[in-house]
A protein has these predicted regions:
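Small beta-barrel nucleic-acid-binding modules, primarily SNase/OB-fold domains
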Residues: 2-5, 14-162
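Short, linear, compositionally biased motifs with a strong N-terminal bias
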Residues: 10-11
Length: 162
């Protein structure tokens, strides 16, 4: 006879990893591309939107990106398809609201995000380029600083002041 606890653990873990899909309610928005959710399995998860990067706190449009994401997903039920983890262990996910609305598209269309620095997704790159051509959001600037460059600059500044 199989151990009931072992079977329960297998069933619960399959809910999280089967197809890498999490379903739950967004409990907080950390920044323009990061949020926390309480999944239906009662575990909390920190999720970063896969394939985009929004301005960092301290950069122009960071607060607007955060507020835009809050309006779209805070306290709403979402489905998150986990794509993997970044080098810091953060879960990267594709989020759908009501099964069809992808907040990455809205952030890119409004000019509030860049596509990923490495291996950009062509669909997202196309949306970003349209926003750039129209001069939306951060693309009003001649040469806005991408968040990955900003983070590196901040790290160097901190190292120099230490």
């Amino acid at each position: 006879m199989k151990n009931p606890l072992f079977i329960a653990l297998i069933i619960l873990s399959s809910n999280v990893f089967a197809g890498n899909i999490l379903t739950g309610k967004v409990t907080s928005v950390i920044d323009g591309n990061t949020f926390e959710m309480l999944a239906d399995d009662n575990d909390s998860y920190k999720i970063m939107l896969f394939g985009i990067d929004c301005p960092e706190p301290g950069q122009e449009f960071a607060e607007k990106a955060k507020k835009t994401l809050e309006k779209m997903i805070l306290n709403k039920k979402v489905n998150v398809t986990i794509q993997g983890k970044d080098r810091w262990g953060n879960r990267l996910g594709v989020v759908l609201i009501d099964g069809t609305i992808d907040p990455r598209h809205d952030l890119l269309e409004a000019g509030l995000a860049w596509t990923a620095e490495r291996d950009p997704i062509q669909e997202l790159e196309t949306i970003k380029e349209k926003a750039r051509e129209k001069g939306k959001g951060l693309w009003k600037e001649q040469d806005p600083t991408p968040p990955w460059i900003y983070r590196r600059q901040q790290t160097l500044t901190q190292l120099k002041s230490s």
